[in-house]
């Protein structure tokens, strides 16, 4: 026992007294401190190691007891909930001290820990105990003490050990920041990725997939590409049904900012599937509170499931639109031919799955675009039908017989007939309660269905082939055989601008959607026709500034559409800016006069006397594709997000579908 007591006394003094003792040293120097302190886990033996097995065993037991006695207070101080204090008098009911270091603690890597455990078990029991004590001390230490420990250890490392640390740390410091960050920040990061990168991100892990597939990210992707050209990648996808885009935009934007707005009552939104045309009803975001609240940080799966809706996921919408857009790009389409008219098809329009066609055979036919079935035939005109337009409730047609007829196209009943033109009606367009009609009598007639008033717009010197109403700005565009296009003010009943440049009869005029943005980089000055010009009404008071930033009208009255397209029998298509009257671009490619024209923000479709249909990029002027098949001049075209329809004097209607 004398030997054991002496060992304990020497060890305690070596641990807690940095000054080396100069008397009472035992004969062996196992516990002698180095530089004043020596580790209690140093199991090395010196040249004076005792050969007596019993004494060696007692010393080992003493070391273990001493180690436990000195480590226990440290562990009890920093992790009292896991390690009961020894004689400290600290109440277990007292809460543990704050541990800010736990917030940044990483999750253990299972394969690495298995390998570490295997290596530990290969060591002697005493070495295992010593290493376990070191790990316990470091694990219990707060951040500041950990830094001190690490600095001391690094100071004692040799180059091979430092190399091991360097190679290990390189992998350990990699952090899964996407799942570690709040969802709204992760959404913001992912929204900067392109489509391919976003799909690859979804393959990293379940957590990444949950975030990368979220509606917040893909809604932004749809907004960036659908019905417009992306400024980053140059891709544009076909138009999506607008109601759903608007209905979910506000909710998704608030989710992206980390704020949840819960409606007082669920909102039902009717939408038409962009690929199937089937009506769908969707509930708003699920919730139980009508207040605007700050979102709490939740686990990824729980957090995203709260915001599930009955809508089709935006990623699926984007995927379908991307397939259709790719088919448009490479010309992959299926063709259906509808036969039924006995004379040339002169006008058409389609919405969803319903197609209406008008012909010189004096009839209007209603078709099911999916099945090709002729649903009904509207009869009543006594001459060829040159123009028509329909909405959900009515169809209005114009004929060479000088009449306008209003139909219930669902039943085939003719509701009313309007007369007023002195010549055949060859162009019409209505929007809201305003109807405009163009005639061979060289006039444009405006019909107001609300107050039953009518008036004429005079100014063209030849047939008026096409008209276009913009009820927002209360203006009308008209195209005429006098080779001009005119812009009319419905309030003053005056022509406020005349566009001149075509050298053939102008057959069509259409405004481009307000979302369309002309790319100035493609605007080459040499492309502008030197013959193109703009003029105003003879009255000086009706002249309008040609500055692009100048308003057309005083006050808050909206300006007319900024860009318009025209086609003429001079075989060209022209893009105009209404603010300045400039012809921005001329599209060359057709061999004969262009009779038909349709466009959206992504493409232009034209049909001509040369029996060809061409697809154009409105920004660059490039002809992307040419379709043939008709045996007569193409007299009318219609454009949708995933198809276009053509009618010809060969009595056929052809549907080019890019869905499949």
From Swiss-Prot:
Residues 175-221 form the F-box domain. WD repeats lie at residues 340-379, 381-419, 421-457, 459-500, 542-586, 587-626, 629-660. Keywords: Repeat, Transcription, Transcription regulation, Ubl conjugation pathway, WD repeat. Residues 1-13 have a biased composition (Basic and acidic residues). Pathway: Protein modification; protein ubiquitination. Signal peptide: none annotated. InterPro entries: F-box-like_dom_sf (IPR036047), F-box_dom (IPR001810), G-protein_beta_WD-40_rep (IPR020472), Quinoprotein_ADH-like_sf (IPR011047), SCF_subunit_WD-repeat (IPR051075), WD40/YVTN_repeat-like_dom_sf (IPR015943), WD40_repeat_CS (IPR019775), WD40_rpt (IPR001680). Residues 531-548 have a biased composition (Polar residues). GO terms for biological process: protein ubiquitination. Residues 1-34, 86-108, 521-553 are annotated as: Disordered. It holds the Pfam family F-box-like. Component of the SCF(sconB) E3 ubiquitin ligase complex involved in the regulation of sulfur metabolite repression, probably by mediating the inactivation or degradation of the metR transcription factor. Belongs to the WD repeat MET30/SCONB/SCON-2 family. Component of the SCF(sconB) E3 ubiquitin ligase complex. This is Probable E3 ubiquitin ligase complex SCF subunit sconB.
